Amino acid sequence: MFFVLSPAKNLNEKDPAPVSEFTQPDLLAESDILMQQLRELAPQQIAELMHVSDKIALLNAQRNAEWNTPFTPENAKQAVFMFNGDVYEGMDANTLDIGQIRYLQNHVRLLSGLYGLLRPLDLIQPYRLEMGTAFANLRGKNLYEFWGDIITNLLNDTLAQAGSNTLVNLASQEYFKSVNTKKLRARLITPIFKDEKNGKYKIISFYAKRTRGLMVRYAAEHNITDPEMLKNFNYEGYVFNDAASNESEWVFMRSEQIK
């Protein structure tokens, strides 16, 4: 069983990683092709392409200029500790023990606009390139065309090598669109997290993102290898709702009074 997650725009570059173990991204040669093109963009072009402020555009122009291989612990950081958004706050990998971190390495993959598909302990350098960015490149008009089936093929290889036939999708639609589900050789499960508000259950973005990370933490803390055991997920008041679920979409609900 493997989980896939989205990356985060917010990065933690300052705090040292709590573990020394690391791996290298499998698709770094592809990343280098993208970065060569990104380096050609002036800050104003980055601002327009990514719809960000001049300050953020300048920061990322500097990141692009400084991006260089090979990656080492001195010039890069493991992805699971670099990403710092809602999902990763829910996962809180910094407080997992080494055995649980290794569980993440063996069961979790992170989708990325620049790096394609990452293991949690893959070293990365800071960047900003969301998968949905309309970045024209050598292979097409956007990143979905750049990556084509590369991410899907690597996922299939990863699943086959592990003898696994289940992929749990905890990524956003923007990122999971980079996976060709028609060519994916795995059973696909998509957990959905709903919160009660004014008597009705709905997906609330902040809670849903955070809970995706919480589910991965739950799996690591309980060393889960059987997908069915995920139905026991109960962190922060969520409960599996069998009636609202089907074979591929598993719905977890939390009532208002539990928050």
Swiss-Prot record:
Family assignment from sequence similarity: Belongs to the UPF0246 family.
Descriptive protein name: UPF0246 protein NMCC_0856
Domain of life: Bacteria
Secretion signal span: none
Annotated GO CC locations: cytosol
GO biological process: response to hydroperoxide
Pfam family, one: H2O2_YaaD
Species this protein is from: Neisseria meningitidis serogroup C (strain 053442)
InterPro entries named among the record's database cross-references: YaaA
HAMAP family associated with the record: UPF0246
